[in-house]
């Protein structure tokens, strides 16, 4: 920042330094007065003038150096001068050295303030944490998805085994029910009737498919009392 300010000052000195040494003020061109006398031109300020008398003032017939800007003489409108004959390369161009110096300092301060503002806005602002880019790796994707695949496969195998066991148990139960259902009608059909006598026990054959304890099939028959007026034939002899 200090280097930039020094550079601006150096440029100003190189631009206006030699001009200030050669032409510190305006040049009053030579003129011819009313009597016809010619007066040579001079550079403002003259030896007897002050340092701020850098402006050519007066009239076309009488010219002198002064410091008042409102009294400046427009030498381009005068017709009684022979400036081109005296100095062919010099024209009547006003040079406002104080205004140029003040303007250059003002511009330098503006540039300096702008640089300070930019520095404060960019360097003193808290930096936000930069987000790292997400990198996709096939190896990490495989390592993440492989346990999930194995877990889902084991769950499917376990569910298949449980469903197979359930279906086999249901099939066995249905077969047992079917055999039990088919065995019941055979239980209702007894074998040949035993002799209707006392002291004999009835032994019913239990089918293989009927799952009932055998103690309910062997029991003695109680003797019924004879009916009055009726006689039962004895089938034991036959």
From Swiss-Prot:
InterPro entries from the UniProt entry: Shisa, Shisa_N
Sequence ranges on the Cytoplasmic membrane side: 120-238
GO biological process, one term: negative regulation of canonical Wnt signaling pathway
Keyword Lyase set for record: no
Keywords of this entry: Developmental protein, Endoplasmic reticulum, Membrane, Signal, Transmembrane, Transmembrane helix
Changes seen on gene knockout: Mutants exhibited no phenotype in either head development or somitogenesis.
Topology of the protein relative to the lipid bilayer: Single-pass type I membrane protein
Top-level taxonomic group: Eukaryota
Signal peptide: 1-21
Subcellular location, record wording: Endoplasmic reticulum membrane
Lumenal face residues: 22-98
Disulfide bonds: none
Transmembrane regions listed in the UniProt entry: 99-119
Keyword Transmembrane helix: yes
Gene Ontology CC, one term: endoplasmic reticulum membrane
Family in the record: Belongs to the shisa family.
Described purpose of this protein according to its UniProt entry: Plays an essential role in the maturation of presomitic mesoderm cells by individual attenuation of both FGF and WNT signaling.
UniProt protein name: Protein shisa-3 homolog
Record organism: Mus musculus (Mouse)
Lineage, top ranks: Eukaryota, Metazoa, Chordata, Craniata, Vertebrata
Gene: Shisa3
């Amino acid at each position: 920042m200090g280097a930039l300010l020094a550079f601006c000052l150096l440029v100003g000195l190189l631009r206006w330094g030699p001009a200030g040494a050669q032409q510190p003020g305006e040049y009053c061109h030579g003129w011819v007065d009313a009597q016809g006398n010619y007066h040579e031109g001079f550079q403002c300020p003259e030896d007897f003038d002050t340092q701020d008398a850098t402006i050519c003032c007066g009239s076309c017939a009488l010219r002198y150096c002064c410091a008042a800007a409102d009294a400046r003489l427009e030498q381009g409108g005068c017709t009684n001068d022979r400036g081109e004959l005296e100095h062919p390369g010099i024209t009547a161009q006003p040079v406002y050295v104080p205004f140029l110096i003040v303007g250059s300092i003002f511009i330098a301060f503006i540039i300096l303030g702008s640089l300070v503002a930019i520095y404060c806005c960019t360097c003193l602002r808290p930096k936000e944490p930069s987000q790292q880019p997400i990198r996709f790796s096939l190896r990490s994707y495989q390592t993440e998805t492989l346990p999930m695949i194995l877990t889902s496969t084991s769950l499917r195998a376990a569910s298949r085994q449980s469903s197979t066991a359930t279906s086999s148990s249901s099939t066995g139960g249905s077969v047992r029910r079917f055999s039990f259902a088919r065995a019941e009608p055979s239980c209702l059909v007894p074998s040949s009737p035993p002799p209707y006598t006392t002291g004999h026990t009835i032994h019913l054959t239990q089918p293989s498919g009927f799952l009932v304890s055998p103690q309910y099939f062997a029991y003695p028959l109680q003797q019924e009392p004879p009916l009055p007026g009726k006689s039962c034939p004895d089938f034991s002899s036959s």
